A protein has these predicted regions:
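Contiguous, well-ordered alpha-helical segments that form the cores/surfaces of helical PPI scaffolds
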Residues: 244, 502-515, 536, 693
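Charged, amphipathic alpha-helical regulatory modules used
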Residues: 2-121, 711-712, 716-717
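Short connector loops/turns at beta-strand edges and beta->alpha or beta->beta junctions
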Residues: 36, 429-433, 512-515
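Short, intrinsically disordered, low-complexity segments enriched in Ser/Thr and Pro
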Residues: 47-48, 539-547, 719-735
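Long insertion/accessory domains within large nucleic-acid-processing enzymes
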Residues: 681-733
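Conserved catalytic cores of very large enzyme subunits
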Residues: 103-107, 113-498, 519-520, 524-686, ...
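Metallocofactor- and cofactor-centric catalytic cores in central/energy metabolism, strongly enriched
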Residues: 282-286, 290, 515, 707-715
Length: 735
């Protein structure tokens, strides 16, 4: 538990005008801290030095009140501090203070300096080239996107309200996807209305595309839609109930084969013939879709972040599509049968359909279990829990962003064709560290940061509304967003009245509670209640904002693929290395249990389940870490069954790494910058297949490295179940 000395009381009679135009109460403690920080760099802070510093602070405050009794600007305070230091002949202290202040001013300028940003990219700064583990920074189209991104980020920071830009640069908040927005009025992620587009046709480029007459054509069209949608937004795209969407086109294949059979096949064999041919068509079509998605590159310089939801279909075409999706994933990609990273597979469990032994689709659940033990996907949704948490059933947009239940003007439930307008994440651990163990101070700073986040989110909405249908025809004019607008119509009609969501993100509840209650707080009811109060307070606020602005503000448990690194790195610079908080070099995602500890899967789920229930239902996922499960799928089934009534969305993390030199299969060992075969030491991405859960999606960290903080977090994970992490030990490799 961190205990810090009592801090000075802010002066409520004097206001400070910040660089971004905000007015805040003058706080003497900030001057005191700045001088102590400078002193620690240039001298031993003895009791005598403490007394000198105290006297200096008194003089500075007296001078400020004398010259600026009503209000003072930041630069005026800094000038007085420098003058008093020089007057007192504290030259070393003055030099350090001035150097630090100048450096801060320089850092602020660099963030909006396009030339500096391009320089970082050309020098392959890790924070730039590895920010997104799905982007291969060695290839030309990604390099072009990264170049455009640093330009967009620099311009975007200048477009943001000053106090929002300042809070982002300091690390108080994170305005996500600055490389795309607000420079362009793009949307984030969505559930594509594939059903409407396939039924009614659409247009891409110069081609008018009619409704498909076969499942092969349908999946080909879907891959083209995905490529175009992913190039028109910056977040992930999902297909909800893809088995049910594609089944009518598989039935067209069946009817065609049945008609052909009338000419060539005996009457009693015609249906069998048509069904066998249709099964092959379904398999080939779904295999083509998997390969298409994994070979697509969008204008964003990456494979589209794509998720396929399935599992609720019951007729034979729907069931066959479900089985094909799973069998194709089990088989793997290419001659080496590598694990496909995309699309993310999301299988729905439902009581009475596939959950229990004896239910109609229980056999497909068994296939899903086999697939998860071998390829980690599918993740699973608990149908009834998703309805409870979000108001209706749907798959997440991208990896974890959930729409809330919504009905149109005719009272019809609508999910596909809806979208998210962006995310702003608050750095909760920083608030805890700044509060120095004072809970009242925590809530005071928390309130201030929530106000900034509100302004940032409202700006996201307003900027997105400035798009025109012509900016993204596939989204607004040709059906991906569910309605087909004219070129001059307002896109806001697809966003307002809570049709779209806008997300308030958060990170690091573990670290927050650690500041106040110590690092083993998980079984402390007071500590857990405190973390739940944070979620409840955020929930209260987003409901008020939704009522005020007319858009659905939701709480989002941020994936933090690179933010886990950025926030922790900035806070290490600000507060130093603090045990169990910044010394780990990463912050824990959202409400997740400390990854370094090993509760059972059941204990972990029981601990985490209350956070989405408390309000974090706009985006969430739970994981459990397992040993090799391929010989024990029943162990995984026990967790899935236990989770069904407790959590809505569950992922499987299990060792599936492979070395093609020595044939080792299991868990690779973390190295300083990646992973290596524990048998022969091989780390060549050409001859290994390393698959780790990066955040909501899987990643291949040897082929596409991730930022340092995420790598540290993955390396720190421990298993939640006993068992071997080796499937095949591998043989000796002679050089």
């Amino acid at each position: 538990m961190i205990v810090l000395e009592e801090k000075a009381v802010p002066d409520p009679t004097l206001f400070v005008e910040k660089r971004d135009g905000r007015r805040v109460i003058f706080d003497v403690d900030k001057i005191d801290k700045a001088l102590h920080k400078a002193a620690e760099k240039v001298m031993d802070v003895t009791p005598l030095v403490e007394k000198r510093l105290s006297t200096l602070v008194e003089r500075i405050v007296e001078e400020i009140h004398s010259r600026f009794p009503q209000g003072v600007k930041i630069y005026e305070i800094q000038n007085i501090v420098e003058h008093e230091l020089l007057e007192a002949k504290e030259y070393a202290l003055a030099e350090e203070y001035i150097t630090y202040r100048t450096q801060r001013d320089f850092e602020r300028s660099k963030a909006t300096d396009i030339n500096f940003s391009i320089h970082k990219l050309l020098n392959k700064d890790q924070a730039v080239v590895n920010e997104n583990a799905n982007k291969d920074s060695d290839v030309f189209n990604t390099q072009r996107d990264l170049t455009a991104g640093v330009v967009g980020k620099s311009i975007g920071l200048q477009m943001l309200p000053k106090h929002v830009a300042n809070a982002h640069q300091k690390g108080d908040i994170h305005y996500h996807d600055l490389d795309y927005s607000p420079y362009t009025p793009m949307t984030n992620c969505c559930l594509i209305d594939f059903k409407g587009m396939l039924e009614n046709g659409f247009k891409i480029g110069n081609a008018e595309v009619e409704s498909p007459k076969s499942i092969q054509t349908a999946t080909a069209q879907i891959s083209q839609i995905i490529a175009n949608v992913a190039s028109s937004q910056y977040g992930g795209c999902s297909a909800d109930r893809i088995d049910e969407v594609l089944a009518p086109y598989a039935e067209k294949n069946y009817q065609k084969h049945l008609k052909d059979a009338e000419e060539w096949v005996l009457p009693d064999k015609r249906q069998e013939y048509a069904w066998k041919k249709t099964q092959k068509d379904i398999y080939d079509a779904m295999q083509s879709l998997e390969y298409e998605i994994n070979t697509l590159f969008t204008s964003n310089g990456q494979t589209p972040f794509t998720s396929l939801g399935f599992g609720l279909g019951t007729n034979r075409f729907e069931r066959e599509i479900q089985k094909a999706i799973l069998n194709i994933r089990i088989k793997g990609l290419g001659s080496e049968h590598r694990t496909a990273i995309f699309p993310k597979l999301i299988f729905t469990l439902k009581r009475g359909l596939n959950l229990e032994e004896g239910s109609p689709n229980y056999d497909i659940k068994q296939l899903a279990l086999e697939c998860a033990t071998k390829r980690m996907y599918p993740d699973v949704l608990s149908y009834d829990k998703i309805v409870e948490l979000t108001g209706s059933f749907k798959v997440p947009m991208g990896c974890r962003s959930f729409l809330q239940g919504w009905k149109d003007e005719n009272g019809v439930e609508v999910n596909s064709g809806r979208m998210n307008l962006g995310v702003v994440t608050v750095n909760l651990p920083r608030i805890a560290l700044e509060s120095e163990g004072d809970l009242n101070k925590f809530w005071e700073i928390f309130n201030e940061r929530m106000n900034i986040a509100e302004d940032a989110l409202v700006y996201r909405v307003e900027r997105t509304k400035e798009a025109t249908p012509a900016n993204a025809p596939i989204l607004y004019q040709y059906g991906a967003f569910g309605r087909r607008l004219g070129k001059e119509e307002s896109v806001d009609q697809l966003f307002k009245n809570r049709r779209a969501t806008i997300s308030l993100g958060y990170i690091g509840l573990y670290e927050v509670a650690t500041v106040f209650f110590g690092n083993n707080w998980e079984n402390n009811p007071e500590a857990k209640e405190f973390t739940l109060d944070i979620i409840r307070d955020m929930k209260r606020r987003v409901e008020e904002w939704s009522d005020q602005y007319g858009y659905h503000f939701s709480i989002y448990s941020t994936p933090s693929e690179s933010l886990t690194d950025r926030f922790c790195r900035l806070d290490t610079e600000k507060f130093g290395s603090i045990p169990d908080i910044t010394d780990k070099e990463y912050y824990t995602n959202s409400f997740h249990y400390d990854v370094r500890k090993n509760p059972t899967p059941f204990e972990k789920l029981d601990f985490e389940k209350v956070y989405p229930e408390a309000g974090a239902s706009g985006g969430f996922i739970h994981y459990c870490e397992y040993p090799v499960l391929q010989q024990n799928p029943k162990a995984l089934e026990a967790v899935w069954d236990y989770a069904y009534d407790r959590v809505g969305y569950l992922g499987t993390n299990t060792p599936i790494d492979r070395c093609y030199k020595c044939d080792f299969e299991g868990d690779f060992e973390p190295t300083e910058r990646g992973f290596a075969c524990p048998n022969c030491g091989n780390n060549d991405p050409k001859t290994v297949d390393v698959v780790k859960r990066t955040c909501g999606y899987l990643g291949n960290p040897q082929a596409r490295p991730m930022v340092n903080g995420r790598h540290k977090e993955i390396a720190a994970r421990v298993k939640h179940m006993n068992g071997s992490t080796i499937k095949t030990a591998g043989h000796e490799v002679r050089n």
